[in-house]
Amino acid sequence: MSLADSVLAINNDLPIRTDSPVHSGKVRSVYWLTDADSRRLITTKGYNVPEDTPLAIMVISDRISAFDCIFHGEGGLKGIPGKGAALNAISNHWFKLFAENGLADSHILDIPHPFVWIVQKARPIKVEAICRQYITGSMWRAYSKGERVFCGITLPEGLEKDQKLPELLITPSTKGILTGIPGVPAQDDVNISRSDIEANYQAFGFEKLEDIDLYEKLLKDGFKVISKALADIDQVFVDTKFEFGYVTDKDGNSKLIYMDEVGTPDSSRIWDGAAYRDGKILENSKEGFRQFLLNHFPDPDVLLNKDRMPEREALARDNDLPLEAMMQVSRTYTGVAEKVTGAPIPLPANPKADIIKILREEYDLIV
């Protein structure tokens, strides 16, 4: 089979039994199981959740998005070989480490295949929980233009690009478009302060005011666990985005959990430690792909200017990126995953067929 065949680009057409529309995100697709199948799996697989918990099959793809667009390569390559399996493997590793360190649970109940999670339904917090240890990216661009207050936090004068910040900063933004919140524009991905969240905690999805402290603790503790583990393999954990939600446990109590992915090259910046000590930035995350795109196209403003979104979408749709650029991203993702987990990343020749086979034979979920 060709390299293109090994890439799972379309992940919303699997014949999984469901009575709800498939939810397709930029990278993952979610298939909500029927009530009968959810109850059957909870019983037969022994998942530690209430018997009426809705379950979903979450299938990751190898697609790559940047600047809110999906990009593709030469030779019919619609994604990055190994990317999906690498992202899941990294998240699985960090969630396991979180559990070992006594942090919160995640939404994942089972991992049938490197591309697949079985997850429990959660009530999401409508906050992108962003943590920054270094000043770079959008924060540096704003700081260099004179901004000093970020999400209600005042930064000192004299900071330099890419330097370590005096303390770990929490700089949240809105998740989705939220309306009716004083002082918060009804736009996706708007920076907010802790005081914004406190004053409107229920609108942001928090069940109790004190859970804001818990979310910040889980964010900082999770960051520190990953940062320490990455330092052990000479990688620098620069910044990251976590997501949180509530689930109901077997005793009927709400508990805050980690959701989505954590500490991956998609959701984080990761730098090579040796290069950083040498005064250079070597990206081991999607940031390297973003920088490639900014250098590859003659007018990078198309990628940065939100007012030029139609042009940007056409740019992504109409241009096949060089194969070597796509494979460099593949090497970055699989390389980080193998360093983090200490194990090779499986690259199945036909992942879709493998997923269908496992979900049919071991879970009886294929129609």
UniProtKB/Swiss-Prot annotation:
Pathway involvement of the protein, from the record: Purine metabolism; IMP biosynthesis via de novo pathway; 5-amino-1-(5-phospho-D-ribosyl)imidazole-4-carboxamide from 5-amino-1-(5-phospho-D-ribosyl)imidazole-4-carboxylate: step 1/2
Catalytic activity: 5-amino-1-(5-phospho-D-ribosyl)imidazole-4-carboxylate + L-aspartate + ATP = (2S)-2-[5-amino-1-(5-phospho-beta-D-ribosyl)imidazole-4-carboxamido]succinate + ADP + phosphate + 2 H(+)
Lineage: Bacteria, Pseudomonadati, Pseudomonadota, Gammaproteobacteria, Alteromonadales
Protein name: Phosphoribosylaminoimidazole-succinocarboxamide synthase
Family matches, as CDD domains: SAICAR_synt_Sc
Alphabetical keyword list: ATP-binding, Ligase, Nucleotide-binding, Purine biosynthesis
GO cellular component: cytoplasm
Ligase among keywords: yes
Organism: Shewanella baltica (strain OS185)
SUPFAM superfamilies, per database record: SAICAR synthase-like (SSF56104)
Family from the record: Belongs to the SAICAR synthetase family.
UniProt gene name: purC
Broad EC category: ligase
Record-linked PROSITE patterns: SAICAR_SYNTHETASE_1
PANTHER family attached to this UniProt entry: PHOSPHORIBOSYLAMINOIMIDAZOLE-SUCCINOCARBOXAMIDE SYNTHASE (PTHR43700:SF1)
Enzyme Commission number(s) from the entry: 6.3.2.6
GO molecular function terms noted in the UniProt entry: ATP binding; phosphoribosylaminoimidazolesuccinocarboxamide synthase activity
GO biological process, one term: 'de novo' IMP biosynthetic process
Cysteine-cysteine disulfides: none
